[in-house]
């Protein structure tokens, strides 16, 4: 019984990995059909549906992976790092680095892969970015408690600016067909971004 569960879990992972790879390829800029995905995995469409009730659920599983990966690591940053600017830098670098290492998932994060899918998936990504923005806002607000001095600019504006920078770099990565990596020249870009945090 345990072997059967492991085999099923492995097949589910294989399907999700194939979907992510298809999103990374030129197929990712078009609607991905279950027929194309089944051919990529080497199974029938019926076999896909034995593991996932719908293509929406496949995308939902990838979004869960993105969310778990980012939120878990953000929480580790918040636990380990106490300096506000360092925290913000690490969170921004985490988001950009995750996108760079997972180009297919970046198409989901930017919404490009979801244009042809159900609206609820875009809603899930919106919620993820709202959670990240709330985390950034909280870090910005805690500066006054931790360091004795807050920002003169509203923390909502600053959090939105940091998130817009991340989203812009991820969109540029997708638009360039993954040529312009989000972390390229980060050590030069970060001081420009950090200078806005006043």
From Swiss-Prot:
Membrane-spanning ranges: none
A GO MF term: DNA-binding transcription factor activity
Pfam families per the UniProt record, alphabetical: SlmA-like_C, TetR_N
A GO cellular component entry from the record: cytoplasm
Coiled coil ranges: 117-145
Top-level division of the source organism's lineage: Bacteria
InterPro entries per the UniProt record, alphabetical: DNA-bd_HTH_TetR-type_CS, Homeodomain-like_sf, HTH-type_TetR-like_transc_reg, HTH_TetR, NO_SlmA, SlmA-like_C, Tet_transcr_reg_TetR-rel_C_sf
NCBIfam families: PRK09480.1
Name the UniProt record assigns to this protein: Nucleoid occlusion factor SlmA
Species this protein is from: Enterobacter sp. (strain 638)
Gene (UniProt): slmA
